[in-house]
Amino acid sequence: PILRMGTKDFIKKCNDAEIDGVILPDLPLDESVEFCNNLKNKNISPILLVAPNTSEKRIKKISKLAGDLIYAVSILGITGNDLSSKNNLKNYLAKVKDNSETPFMVGFGISTNDDVNWFNSFSDGAVVGSAVIKKVLKDTKKGVVENFVKNLKK
């Protein structure tokens, strides 16, 4: 959609909507330099992704190109997956931290207070998406999502 719209129009629409960051999950790194720099010139942070199989060299490149944040994908797979092997992620998260000066948050499969606390101890924060969507779909009463998020922070 971004390329079809045109990068200049996309950046203008983001700027008009006062968007301050965009996640770019499928933009090839080697083709993204100009686009990411144009975003940053308009104070829009390009949020780039790293994964457990991302090399140290590539993490360094991503760190230099990213805006205010890197999104560290916790698993190879789709969002909402189980994190039963999360203890094996310590080396990966240390690799991201050691090879990037850019703050990073971890996402994919994070759904409990224990998950959030665990990932917060190895990163700059945790992203909870699918679990919030599931709460909204399960219960539309006012305050359900707010209470869920408050409990994640405890």
Where are each of the predicted segments found?
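Active-site beta->alpha loop and helix N-cap motifs at the rims of alpha/beta catalytic domains
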Residues: 1-24, 147-150
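Alpha/beta catalytic cores of nucleotide-metabolism and tRNA/nucleoside-modifying enzymes
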Residues: 92-102, 111-154
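Short beta-strand/loop segments at the ligand-binding rim of alpha/beta enzyme cores
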Residues: 39-49, 97-107
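Charged helix-capping and loop-helix junction motifs
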Residues: 6-12, 84-92, 144-146
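Glycine-rich phosphate-binding active-site loops on the catalytic face of alpha/beta enzymes
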Residues: 21-31, 72-81, 109, 122-141
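Glycine-rich beta-to-alpha transition loops that act as phosphate-gripper elements at the mouths
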Residues: 1-4, 28-29, 50-54, 105-113
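Catalytic cores of alpha/beta
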Residues: 10, 54-65, 106, 110-126
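Glycine/Thr-rich beta-alpha phosphate-binding loop at enzyme active sites
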Residues: 49, 59-98, 135-141
